[in-house]
Structure formats: structure tokens, C-alpha cells
């Protein structure tokens, strides 16, 4: 017999307990005790940025909790986030809002983001508090780290890129926070800076980089840099950069130094991909007693049939290269481009050499040697060892972090503009990912757990 839902008249009174409506295994319930501990000193941290008089503001803890909800469930639009918190019981419970409590207006987030939150660097503070909670839970071993970067598309059209000299920065439509941040970065460096403007720049988000790294499609983007502990893939540090390989590699040193200063953690080994295998980075790591399990960024091999660079033997005692016919290539000691010394053969030796046709078309042969070639040689010696293979497998953990962020959290494109906006979004993403890792490791179902949805 077909049933019918009865009762057109709603009840006048309900006995309702919001606490009992949230399942025991709900993500927000598992995360809640961690967030409560992490945000314990939030008001104290933000107190200097609020006035002692005037109307009470929106509770900053409420805004942080709402942002955590948004990044947990891929709701990065603050307007939509406010609508979802208004309707969703679990979101209300996590944000400590009763059924009759009013949800803050979406504009509140913009005002605080560009003011108190950035001035106090509160998102960085929350991120570091979550990392310390992971350390207290024993999830961070501090023995091996992995580093990598992923491109996140900027909120800028890839069809509207222009040369810098084509843009009038004084135009009214260019008076935005992102443009002001970009111009002030040059003012801070001074007139003698060696920094050059890129060939293509976005008029609306000039801090982003013109890149073809992601999906081989040219676009404007930012580099999301993660430094993780390979034990449980906890994100130890995060850094926002333009999506350029040079900036991403430089961020590695920033994150490792900051991690050592903030948490007292220095890894014994670091794993990364070939982009980080430059002589400069390898030498820096060895100088800090960190073993680099990183493939070396090798010189391009010749494809014209001439003798490759490997055919020349380096004599460390005499500081010369020996060609296949036994002649030396010497250097003047001059460092070119801040990284290499050139070793040149004698034109007379080359003229009389029967192997010249297979060696060079020039009057002499030149071999470039990195000033940190010893560090490169050491990194090469690690290739193929069991430790190297194990570290290479652990590198997948940081790549999985990026995949999880883009697929599960739908974080494929920026919503905010400017490097500060990217920094805010990346810190929130890392906070949520670490919270989920910690909650999954710590949570244990209560005995005879029964998920009750009735009051």
C-alpha cells in the first residue's frame, strides 16, 4: 500500500539538540577538539589589532572556523560559505552558532583579511599551531623531508597578458590591491635592484607568473610550495611564489631555514625532483649537513655526433680536463654567470688533432664546470642506492598532497589576487590538510558507536 506523508501543519514547538544531530564520526566533530586547542590563544594574538572602545566586532574565532569549513569542503567563495553555514547544521555546530544565531556578512571576511588578519599574520600563526599539534601527537619524525611545488592558476585571463611597457599603471582601473602590492615590491628593493620585469605580465594580477608548466598550457599562475615530513606527510611549511622554477627552488631554502628556526627541526635528508638538483642547492644542503636524495640537473647532451661532455676526464689534482686524445683543457679561474668556470683547449692542439672533426667545429673545445661540481658529484654517487630509491618513493607523498588538494578540495584556481592573497589561500589549504591528517590519526570510534540522527 502506498504511503502518504501526512501533516500539513508544522509543529509549534520542537525539542531540538544541535549537539545530538552531528554524527560521532563526522569530519568536523573529529577536527573540532584540535581546532579548539589550536585557537586557544587567538584572541590574545589579535587583541592589539582591536580597539578598546566601540561596538563589539564579529568574533575572530568564528571567522577562522568558517574559513576552515570552507576549505574543508571546497567552498572558497565567502558569499556562498555564509549561505551554506546558514543552512547546514554541522557547519553551524562547528562554528558554535545556535539555530537562531546570525551568520556574519560575507564582507566581514574581506575587511578583516586586508586588515587585522594580514597585519597580525594570524593565518601563519594558526598554521604553526597546527604543526605543533602534529608534533605533540608524534606525527612528525623530523628525519626526512620532501619538497615540491605545484602551479595554481591565477585569477587572471591568459588571453590578456601584455608587455610591461604597454600597461599604464596610473590608470584608474589599475588602482587595485594586487597592483599596489606589485609596485610596492619594486619600491622596497630600491632603484639599484637587479630584478627584471617579465616579458609578459597580467594587468590585473602582475605578481603572478606567465607559465606553461601546468598541463602544458600557457597561463598566469602561482607556485604552491610544500615542505612535508615524509613520515605521515604532514606539511611542515608552505610558501607562495610566482610560478617560476627559480622562485620555487629559492623557496626551499626559505622553508628549511624557517622550519629550523620556528620548530627546531632540521632533516637528515631531503628528497625532491630534478628541478632542485642544481649545484647551488646541492652545495647549500650539504653545507647544512642534509643529505640530498635529488636527481642532478645535468647539462644537455650533444646530439650532433660530437664527443659528449662525459668523454672528457677531470683531473682534480691539476684542475684540468683531459680530452679523448690526451690534451688538457685549462681554466683562467673566472666565474661566469655566477656559477661556472670554462675550461678551454689550446687551438694549436686542436689543429693538429686527428679527432677534431668529432670534437668541435670551433678553433678550440670548451667545457663548462659548475663551481659546485663536487656537490653534484656527491649527489650523483647517491643515485641508485637503496636509500635513494626509498626517498624517491617518499617523494610521491608530497605529490599526493597536491592531487588531494586539487581533486578533493577543488583548489585549482586562485580566488584572491596578489602574492599576499596567494599566501592566505595556501596557508588555509595547508591548515585544513594537516587538520584532516591529525584528526584521522587521533580519532577513535567510541565503543558501540551508534550514529543517532533523532533528537
How does the language model describe each region?
Residues 24-68, 73:
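Basic, short loop/linker segments at the boundary and entry of helix-turn-helix/winged-helix-like folds
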Amino acid at each position: 500500500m502506498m504511503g502518504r506523508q501526512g501533516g500539513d501543519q508544522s509543529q509549534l514547538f520542537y525539542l531540538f539538540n544541535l549537539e545530538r544531530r552531528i554524527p560521532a564520526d563526522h569530519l568536523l566533530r573529529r577536527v573540532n577538539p584540535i581546532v579548539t586547542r589550536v585557537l586557544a590563544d587567538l584572541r590574545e594574538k589579535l587583541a592589539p589589532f582591536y580597539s578598546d572602545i566601540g561596538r563589539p566586532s564579529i568574533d575572530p574565532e568564528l571567522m577562522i572556523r568558517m574559513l576552515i569549513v570552507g576549505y574543508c569542503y571546497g567552498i572558497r567563495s565567502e558569499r556562498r560559505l555564509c549561505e551554506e553555514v546558514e543552512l547546514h547544521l554541522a557547519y553551524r555546530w562547528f562554528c558554535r552558532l545556535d539555530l537562531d544565531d546570525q551568520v556574519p556578512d560575507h564582507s566581514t571576511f574581506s575587511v578583516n583579511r586586508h586588515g587585522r588578519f594580514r597585519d597580525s599574520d594570524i593565518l601563519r600563526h594558526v598554521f604553526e599551531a597546527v604543526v605543533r599539534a602534529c608534533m605533540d601527537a608524534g606525527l612528525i619524525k623530523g628525519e626526512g623531508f620532501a619538497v615540491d611545488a605545484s602551479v595554481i592558476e591565477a585569477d587572471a585571463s591568459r588571453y590578456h597578458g601584455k608587455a610591461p611597457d604597454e600597461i599604464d599603471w596610473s590608470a584608474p582601473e589599475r588602482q587595485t590591491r594586487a597592483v599596489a602590492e606589485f609596485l610596492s615590491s619594486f619600491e622596497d628593493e630600491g632603484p639599484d635592484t637587479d630584478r627584471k620585469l617579465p616579458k609578459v605580465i597580467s594587468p590585473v594580477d602582475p605578481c603572478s607568473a606567465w607559465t606553461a608548466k601546468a598541463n602544458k598550457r600557457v597561463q598566469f599562475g602561482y607556485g604552491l610550495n610544500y615542505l612535508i615530513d615524509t613520515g605521515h606527510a604532514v606539511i611542515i611549511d608552505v610558501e607562495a611564489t610566482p610560478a617560476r622554477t627559480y622562485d620555487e627552488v629559492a623557496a626551499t631554502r626559505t622553508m628549511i631555514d624557517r622550519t629550523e628556526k620556528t620548530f627546531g627541526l632540521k632533516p637528515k635528508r631531503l628528497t625532491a625532483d630534478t628541478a632542485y638538483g642544481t649545484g647551488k642547492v646541492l652545495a647549500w644542503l650539504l653545507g647544512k649537513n642534509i643529505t640530498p636524495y635529488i636527481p642532478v640537473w645535468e647539462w644537455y647532451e650533444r646530439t650532433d655526433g660530437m664527443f659528449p661532455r662525459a668523454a672528457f676526464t677531470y683531473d682534480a689534482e691539476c684542475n684540468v680536463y683531459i680530452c679523448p686524445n690526451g690534451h688538457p683543457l685549462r681554466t683562467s679561474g673566472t666565474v661566469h654567470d655566477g656559477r661556472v668556470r670554462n675550461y678551454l683547449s689550446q687551438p694549436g692542439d686542436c689543429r693538429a688533432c686527428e679527432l677534431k672533426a668529432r670534437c668541435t667545429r670551433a678553433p678550440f673545445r670548451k667545457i663548462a664546470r659548475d663551481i659546485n661540481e663536487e656537490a653534484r658529484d656527491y649527489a650523483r654517487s647517491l643515485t641508485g642506492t637503496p636509500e635513494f630509491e626509498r626517498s624517491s618513493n617518499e617523494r610521491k607523498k608530497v605529490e599526493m598532497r597536491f592531487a588531494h588538494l586539487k581533486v578533493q578540495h577543488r583548489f585549482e584556481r586562485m580566488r584572491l589576487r596578489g602574492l599576499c592573497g596567494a599566501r592566505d589561500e595556501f596557508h588555509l589549504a595547508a591548515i585544513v590538510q594537516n587538520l584532516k591528517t591529525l584528526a584521522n590519526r587521533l580519532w577513535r570510534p567510541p565503543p558501540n558507536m551508534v550514529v543517532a540522527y533523532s533528537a
